[in-house]
Swiss-Prot record:
Coiled coil: none
Protein name stated in the entry: Small ribosomal subunit protein uS15
Ranges annotated as biased composition (Basic and acidic residues): 1-16
Subunit architecture: Part of the 30S ribosomal subunit. Forms a bridge to the 50S subunit in the 70S ribosome, contacting the 23S rRNA.
Alphabetic keyword roster: Ribonucleoprotein, Ribosomal protein, RNA-binding, rRNA-binding
UniProt GO MF annotations: rRNA binding; structural constituent of ribosome
Chain positions covered by the region annotation Disordered: 1-24
Gene name of the record: rpsO
UniProt xrefs under SUPFAM superfamilies: S15/NS1 RNA-binding domain
Length: 89
């Protein structure tokens, strides 16, 4: 199950610098966050699905690396993105 194309386009429009900007760290983090959030109910229902959990952990670590990169390059964009996506408590 993946993020639908229309939802993906909305995420790109909301977080990208332009409508076709799919490579910026903000867009990549937002897309990964959407995929991670979609998988949460699956893991609540299937707690022993370790094979898929490994993929989830891979997505989480990739998002973490992208956030670390963004924080090192531009801290203002990092804080804005974290606040927008609600990643930190």
């Amino acid at each position: 199950m993946s993020v639908a194309d229309i939802k993906k386009q909305d995420i790109v429009k909301d977080n990208g610098r332009s409508a076709n900007d799919t490579g910026s760290p903000e867009v990549q983090v937002a897309l990964l966050t959407a995929r991670i959030n979609e998988l949460q109910p699956h893991f609540k229902a299937h707690m022993k699905d370790h094979h898929s959990r490994r993929g989830l952990l891979r997505m989480v670590s990739r998002r973490r690396r992208l956030l670390d990169y963004l924080k090192s390059k531009d801290a203002d964009r990092y804080t804005a993105l974290v606040a927008k996506l609600g990643l930190r408590k």
